[in-house]
Design a protein with these regions (language model features):
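N-terminal auxiliary segments of SAM/dcSAM-dependent transferases
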Residues: 1-23
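S-adenosylmethionine/decaboxylated-SAM
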Residues: 3, 38-100
Length: 100
């Protein structure tokens, strides 16, 4: 990510998103487990959350879980009776996501 893009993303995250212990812990765990830092940003995660929520989704299928960061954002948008299914080909990634 370019410096300007990162600065804008950091600003949006600081002003609009606030702190979230579960998401922060997920990112730390992903790094500690050696996963590539290719998660969506917090702002992108919030956008996924809003899009899923606005669509009224009751079921979400995510292909490619990595460490589960975006999975958490998407799952939070579901109603109580919603269903989140995520698929991950790499065993290590799936184990880390399950921990998160």
């Amino acid at each position: 990510m370019g410096e300007r893009w990162q600065a804008v993303d950091d600003y949006i995250a600081a002003k609009l998103l606030g702190d979230d212990d579960a998401l922060a812990t997920t990112l730390v765990n992903n790094a500690e487990q050696g996963l590539q830092p290719i998660d969506v940003s917090a702002a992108q995660g919030k956008m996924l959350f809003l899009l899923a929520q606005m669509s009224g989704a009751k079921r979400i299928l995510e292909v490619g879980t990595l460490g589960g960061y975006s999975t958490i954002w998407l799952a939070r948008a579901l109603p109580d009776d919603g269903e989140m299914v995520t698929l991950e080909l790499e065993d290590h990634h799936a184990r880390v996501a399950h921990q998160n």
